[in-house]
Amino acid sequence: MEKLQPARLEFVAYDTPYSAAFDDVYHSALGGPAQARHVFLAGNELPARWQDKYRFVILETGFGTGLNFLATWQAWRDDPQRCRRLHFISFEKHPFTLADLATCQQAWPEFAELAAELQQKWPPLVPGMHRLHLNDGQVILTLTFGDAATQLRSIDASVDAFFLDGFSPPKNPELWSPHFCKGLARLTAPGATLATWSVAGHVRQALKDAEFDVAKRPGYIGKRQMLVGRFRSRRPDRHVAPTDRRAIVIGAGIAGSSTAHALAAAGWQVTVLEQATAPATGASSNLAGMLRPLPSADDNRLSRITRAGFLATRALLAALPEARWSPCGVLHLAREPEHEGQQRRAVEQLGFPPEVLQFVESDEASRLLGQPVTIGGWWFPNGGWVQPPSVCRAALAAFPERITTHFNAAVARIVRQNDQWQALDANGNLLAEAPVLVMASGAAAPRFEQFAWLPQRSGRGQVSHLPASVGKPLNTVLFQIGYTIPAIDDTQLIGASLSYEDDESAEREADHRDNLARLRLTLPDFASDLDPATLHGRVGFRPMSPDRMPIVGAVPDTMTATPNTRLHNIPRQPGLWCVQGFGARGIVWSALMADLLVSQLEGEPLPLERDLVDALDPGRFLIKAARNSGGELPSDEETSEPAA
């Protein structure tokens, strides 16, 4: 994995920001905002083309200082006929640090309010996609930090307008190549347009070869000409937005509540059906759970998804002031010296900013924790603990005009009648009806006929509650063999046990004893006199997928596939979706998976790279079965993470 190198901010004549890496300026010295409006907005016939539409999607090839985005956002805000949702996708190989971004944007006082909101939500400089919900969720900025030439193929979107604004072709040839232009053409919506300041002959030819009709237009001050274009193919739009935005969500745990919140934020009317008397009574009822990503030296799929999920959860928590959580940090100690070396090397290889991930030696780990430890490990300064029930309640209450909850509503079966999904109780009474149904009932999902195929196992987990007076108070969440969460409401949490083929709902003293034993391996003197027979806690059942990845997407309409079947060729049951298989990572995954599912439902740009979306698709298990590549559930340290 190539480390992300931040841009180095420099200025040349007229205080114009300049890139030493590409030996080029970020925008015209003769008026950046005016250039953005002339070339990219007017060149794409905006704002006229987005007027009276539900959504409009723009893709930009270089985010740079954010000037084009701010100019577009401002034009959208000023237009009373604007589209309801504006998506803006942009790439940046060398993003600015927050401080440098703010310095650049000080030059445009007309964008001060918008720039402040953007800066408030500016993501840490780590590779991958970053989804920012701005302007009360009506403007969605999807930033991809990395090389656009290689990242373009990971985008799944239907683009209405392209802003071709890389550095000059001689300095940045990859973003003007025939191959790149054909990649842009793959993403076009019907009637898609483009605009760029470059009129180089080979750029025009590359765009023509990619089926764009191009023409020269008068350029901005100091540049005689610019280029505009329109995609000439009439292929149908693959991403059609639904017209009837009503959905049923079964389950009010953290998966279902987050999904209902995301649907409502996108304008859907949502009915949540929960068999219990309140939200978050199953695996999401823990007093608290851990929030942190899971890095790997090779930045594998699990690492990338948990990192994206961690950032999405942080963003959701910021939008839900009633949700209870603490960014106290998470200390993930190594198991033994060899593992300590692996952790240290992973931090060096990843090169993430210190606010995301650090390696700390044992003395610094002891200082952070407030307890002596004998080994170092990973430190996540922005991690912490989250109280899942408070998140569920806050999410369900955020849109009272769009979310209707029904508790004590036990769904016995679901059927599809007249293009509507119906949720029925045991007596056949109709509980709810809608064209879309999302299954988010965790371990209970396989009892429904349409989900009997679901290859998830129920993992029984037990956490133990310790009085806050036991041991010296911890400053951070601690994880090693097991985990410990600092005192919340006079209670510390330790855990968690894990067993399969085990439906015992009562607490077991043996599991409390095991939880204490894991804690004492890390902190030998902590709670050394505590009798496990005196402890209480809670038991939950986690839905675990075979590959430990979530199961999110449209539900297959067939239970068979061939080894050569492609995911997108598997037929799907109309209107039937699932967000399942979160296992012990419900806190870190729920917000991101909800965003992904809503984006798929709406036909909007996806918040994850295509390979990660495929790794979550429910249809993957059919293909794996056909290839005889299914595997046993792995056994690793992560099995003792808290359920949420």
Curated annotation (Swiss-Prot):
Pfam families: DAO, Methyltransf_30. It comes from the Bacteria. GO terms for molecular function: flavin adenine dinucleotide binding; oxidoreductase activity, acting on the CH-NH group of donors; tRNA (5-methylaminomethyl-2-thiouridylate)(34)-methyltransferase activity. Its cofactor is FAD. GO terms for cellular component: cytoplasm. InterPro entries: FAD-dep_OxRdtase, FAD/NAD-bd_sf, MnmC-like_methylTransf, SAM-dependent_MTases_sf, tRNA_MAMT_biosynth_bifunc_MnmC, tRNA_MNMC2, tRNA_S-uridine_synth_MnmC_C. Residues 1-232 are annotated as: tRNA (mnm(5)s(2)U34)-methyltransferase. Keywords: Cytoplasm, FAD, Flavoprotein, Methyltransferase, Multifunctional enzyme, Oxidoreductase, S-adenosyl-L-methionine, Transferase, tRNA processing. Signal peptide: none annotated. It is found in: Cytoplasm. Its EC number is 2.1.1.61, 1.5.-.-. One of its GO terms (biological process) is methylation. In the N-terminal section; belongs to the methyltransferase superfamily. tRNA (mnm(5)s(2)U34)-methyltransferase family. In the C-terminal section; belongs to the DAO family. This is tRNA 5-methylaminomethyl-2-thiouridine biosynthesis bifunctional protein MnmC. It comes from Dechloromonas aromatica (strain RCB).
